[in-house]
Amino acid sequence: NTLGGTCLNVGCIPSKTLLDSSEHFHTALHDFEKHGIDISKPKVNLPNMMARKDEVIKQTCDGVNFLMDKNNITVYNGLGSFVDENTVSIEGDKKSVISGDNIIIATGSKPNYFPGMEPDKQRIITSTEALSLKEIPKHMIVIGGGVIGLSLIHI
């Protein structure tokens, strides 16, 4: 429901943010001692990692919204359908009809799943839920080799 689509909100940006935090943890756990830095054994604070991820998303969304305003771009949210090749009817908070020579339809995307393995958001989750886990699972199977799935296996 925010600008930036899957990548910014529930894909590339949040997965890479968590991956970055994981890499910092790995460095603290395995490399500090090599550099003569003694610290007690580091531990993951998942709520803080998730809060950082959410802040990065917010900052990036705010940047996109700023650019839209700065460039006088009007954004319409809702269900759109073409009336003709230059006109779109939008059902949202209010009904709008817009016309133009150039119209961008940005629908975003949703995770795919196999029949019989529909997400229940508990045991079978999509990447969206995986990026907002409340605790670190002991085991996780990632089905799919896309950018988000590949990032998840390294977090």
Predicted regions and their residues:
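Conserved small/polar residues in nucleotide/adenosyl-binding loops
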Residues: 153-155
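Glycine-rich flavin
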Residues: 1-136
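Beta1/beta-strand and adjacent pyrophosphate-binding region of the FAD-binding site
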Residues: 138-143
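N-terminal Rossmann-fold NAD(P) dinucleotide-binding loop
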Residues: 149-150
